[in-house]
Amino acid sequence: MDLPGPIHDFLLVFLGSGLILGSIGVVLFPNPIYSAFSLGLVLVCISLFYILSNSYFVAAAQLLIYVGAINVLILFAVMFLNGSEYSNDFPLWTLGDGITSQVCISLFISLISTILDTSWYGIIWTTRSNQIIEQDLISNSQQIGIHLSTDFFLPFELISIILLVALIGAIVIARQ
């Protein structure tokens, strides 16, 4: 959107605060239904960020896929679970929690080391040369398709693996 500077800045601050409050709500609400609604708020704020940055296709995809499908699926799954499963009978820290936290910490450290070791200067020059090629393309949809099949192939596949693991986890939880 082409908005005047103060209005654009106000919307950025408003959406950022909504994003932060929604994220805190996802983590801190004791009721999982409220957490799922907070996740919906976070996803809507992210799609509005895309609208502010003139990425209308990505914003529409964000709303349709994440808010319209995945968040509703999460709400249904939470509502079908028995309420007694959320009691305070569980121990605070188990062996599985320790292993999971170690895996998450090691992934975080490897991500930070990869970010610090990457030569960002070379990536900027590669991006500038790709922009010349992209000017000949007809539409934004073609540009998105080319980026998904070339530059973002690995993240796209990793997201599909993460969604597959989440689906398998949901099936395991539903069988118990």
Curated annotation (Swiss-Prot):
UniProt catalytic activity: a plastoquinone + NADH + (n+1) H(+)(in) = a plastoquinol + NAD(+) + n H(+)(out); a plastoquinone + NADPH + (n+1) H(+)(in) = a plastoquinol + NADP(+) + n H(+)(out)
Pfam families: Oxidored_q3
GO molecular function: NADH dehydrogenase (ubiquinone) activity; quinone binding
Membrane topology: Multi-pass membrane protein
Enzyme class: translocase
Quaternary structure and partners: NDH is composed of at least 16 different subunits, 5 of which are encoded in the nucleus.
Location of the protein in the cell: Plastid, Chloroplast thylakoid membrane
UniProt keyword annotations, A-Z: Chloroplast, Membrane, NAD, NADP, Plastid, Plastoquinone, Quinone, Thylakoid, Translocase, Transmembrane, Transmembrane helix, Transport
The EC number(s) this enzyme carries: 7.1.1.-
Signal peptide coordinates: none
Known function: NDH shuttles electrons from NAD(P)H:plastoquinone, via FMN and iron-sulfur (Fe-S) centers, to quinones in the photosynthetic chain and possibly in a chloroplast respiratory chain. The immediate electron acceptor for the enzyme in this species is believed to be plastoquinone. Couples the redox reaction to proton translocation, and thus conserves the redox energy in a proton gradient.
Residue ranges of the TM segments: 10-30, 32-52, 61-81, 105-125, 153-173
Recorded GO CC terms: chloroplast thylakoid membrane
Name of this protein: NAD(P)H-quinone oxidoreductase subunit 6, chloroplastic
Superkingdom classification of source: Eukaryota
Family membership noted in the UniProt record: Belongs to the complex I subunit 6 family.
InterPro entries with a match to the protein in the record: NAD(P)H-Q_Oxidoreduct_6 (IPR050290), NADH_UbQ/plastoQ_OxRdtase_su6 (IPR001457), Nuo/plastoQ_OxRdtase_6_NuoJ (IPR042106)
